[in-house]
């Protein structure tokens, strides 16, 4: 049983989109990865339309169970952050039109999920994406690898929980193999989940 997630690394010039199938044992398989590009000289409304059409086509072609988008965070370049926010809005709207659940994940959440370290650099994330997916190298440009990381992050952080009650979600795939070996990233994330669970279950002392 698998969950299919479409991940989006929003950007106006380059919007990375990656689709992965993730089994209940957290093994991930690459389905598709691409980058939607729009030229800077194109009118803004046409650029957003092109990105929206590209995302819509991929949603309709691969029928994911969920969509995951990188959450906008503060950047020094105001024009860049505005473009990212605009594309994020288009992606949210396009997914909502199809009744798909959408999750937003911060860069730190994605890094922690993929590498086990929330301050990992881009090269470390890209290397782990390639390793998790069994690829000889990370897809290029970086926007493509980032989109895959976002999709994997969502599946590992909560998307797989639906499998425990509803069976296969999204595209059909091979059944999970109980007790299968985890990748280093998967093992680190599972250990982090256990640590978080222990911490959250302990009584908290009120501040004085």
From Swiss-Prot:
Cofactor(s) in the UniProt record: Mg(2+)
Reactions catalysed: Endonucleolytic cleavage at a junction such as a reciprocal single-stranded crossover between two homologous DNA duplexes (Holliday junction)
Enzyme Commission number(s): 3.1.21.10
Keywords, sorted A to Z: Cytoplasm, DNA damage, DNA recombination, DNA repair, DNA-binding, Endonuclease, Hydrolase, Magnesium, Metal-binding, Nuclease
Active-site residues per Swiss-Prot or TrEMBL entry: 9, 70, 143
Family the entry assigns: Belongs to the RuvC family.
HAMAP family: RuvC (MF_00034)
The name this protein goes by in its record: Crossover junction endodeoxyribonuclease RuvC
Species name: Leifsonia xyli subsp. xyli (strain CTCB07)
Gene: ruvC
């Amino acid at each position: 049983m698998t969950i299919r997630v479409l991940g989006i690394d929003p950007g106006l010039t380059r919007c990375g989109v990656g689709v992965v199938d993730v089994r209940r044992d957290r093994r991930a398989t690459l389905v598709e990865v691409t980058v939607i590009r729009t030229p800077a000289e194109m009118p803004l409304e046409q650029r957003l339309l092109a990105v929206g059409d590209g995302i819509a086509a991929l949603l309709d072609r691969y029928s994911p169970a969920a969509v995951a988008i990188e959450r906008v965070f503060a950047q020094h370049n105001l024009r860049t952050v505005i473009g990212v926010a605009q594309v994020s809005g288009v992606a949210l709207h396009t997914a909502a039109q199809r009744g798909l659940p959408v999750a937003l994940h911060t860069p730190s959440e994605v890094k922690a999920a993929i590498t086990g370290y929330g301050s990992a650099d881009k090269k470390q994330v890209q290397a782990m994406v390639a390793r998790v997916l069994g690829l000889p190298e990370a897809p290029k440009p970086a926007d493509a690898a980032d989109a895959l990381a976002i999709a994997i992050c969502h599946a590992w952080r909560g998307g797989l929980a639906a499998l425990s009650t509803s069976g296969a979600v999204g595209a059909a795939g091979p059944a999970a193999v109980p007790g299968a070996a985890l990748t280093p990233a998967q093992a680190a994330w599972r250990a982090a989940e256990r640590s978080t669970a222990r911490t959250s279950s302990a009584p908290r002392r009120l501040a004085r």
